[in-house]
Amino acid sequence: MKTRYFILILAAFISLQGCSRKEDNFAYWAKEVNVSITDNSLRAQVTTTFKESCSYRIRYWENARGERCARTTSMQTGLKGENTCTLIFLYPETHYTFEIIVEDRAVSKRVEFLTGSLPPDVPSYSVDYSSTNDEPLTGYLLQWNANKPGYVTFCDYDGKVVWYQSFGEGIRTAHYNPHTGKLAVMAGFKYGVNDRNFQRLVSEVFVCDLYGHTFFRRKAAEGFLPHLHHEFKTTDDGKMLFVSNFIKAFDLRSRGASTESTDVWGDGFYLCSEDGKVEKSWDCFAELDPIATDYLDPVKTATDYIHANSVEIDSNGDYYMTFNRISELWKIDGNTGDVLYRLGVHGNVSLDGDFPSGGLHAAVALEPDLIMCYANGRDKGYSEGVVYKIDPVAKTATYRTRIVLPAEYSSKDRSNMQKIGDDLYFMNSTVCGKAIFVNGSGEIRRVISRSGISYRAYYFTM
């Protein structure tokens, strides 16, 4: 009897071993692998025909640099039949090798491919300056070009383009959310409004990923938020956040208007669902009455009253906006819409130093009431990267960080700033076309120049 049981156990073990050996063989799972470069020179489409459903990843690397620089895709769900996975962040005209790993056990033969050339209109980038203590970073810079055909790009720390996409029109702004993998893009100019406003209003918005899939595309027109400008981003839960003009008629004859009704183009924001339904809207007019606000001339500024340029939401669900004309940062209650404080010369917060002047852009909430901005300093002749710590109850604020840029790296308008390390910041100076890596003491580590205009730029570790 014991001998019989032993034989049965041995047979089962041999059977399992045989099954294991089969499943360790890539040919057990797949029968065909192909790779192609199609409509985008820096996207490689790997098509695998699986015999059985499975999970798989693709590991790939640049031949010249070897496997030490390999990237691996996220885990993919492979269904029986043909499956496609797209490889991204590739250099142009470069030889690569990849292998497919199925169920973390079976590995395919290695396959080589060659990427294509960049289209001639893709923006170019170059390193202008690198300090002696500069350490290479492995992330990528998101930048774009305001001219047609409207390319959004990622480049590496040396300015080499590794990703691009054309949107047909000049790119006004773009924002990538690494949590969702979504790219939010504003493109085109809104003609037919007036000479002042067409310069900032956009004609179309997109939400897409980095693999060529578009999830949302809509014209900025009646029926869908016709006056969008300056800022569009997706939140971590997939919603869409926009800066927009809000137009309201006022009787400004007491302020010098010649007619009874004047349209004032104020600003605010929209929060929308993934399919474009408005869930929340807010505008500035309850806080700033054009008739009563004496430090602004509402007749002269009617077509662009306070010029909002950014909107941000913090972890508590409250909002922050920057306004360029008045150089102010506002915090807005996410539930009531009340303005909780205003940091600026005409605001209600006292600051342990001079207030921002000559332009303020791109609020980033490092945490609630710890807000980073790019202070343009048109009246000073130099720009600053600033972080404010605001006490919303006492209405006081202090400078936590204040980085002064040299005049040649400053930008009198537009621009933005990021904190990308414990003591490392990225600053995009739009007017001079520079992407600047700098520490908290103002020591510049690297400067990358670009062709064309990129309203903002961002650094991401992928």
Describe the predicted segments one by one.
Residues 36-43, 95, 102-462:
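Histidine-/acidic-rich catalytic cores in large beta-rich domains
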Residues 7-15:
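Bacterial N-terminal signal peptides
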Residues 44-50:
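Aromatic/hydrophobic beta-strand junction motif of beta-rich domains
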Residues 16-36:
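Bacterial Sec-dependent N-terminal signal peptides
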Residues 87-95:
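Surface-exposed, short loops/turns at beta-strand junctions within beta-sandwich domains
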Residues 50-55, 145-149:
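Short proline/glycine-enriched turn/loop motifs at strand-loop junctions of beta-rich domains
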Residues 55-73:
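Extracellular low-complexity, O-glycosylation-prone stalks/linkers
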Residues 81-86:
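Short S/T/G- and acidic-enriched coil/turn segments that sit immediately N-terminal to beta-strands
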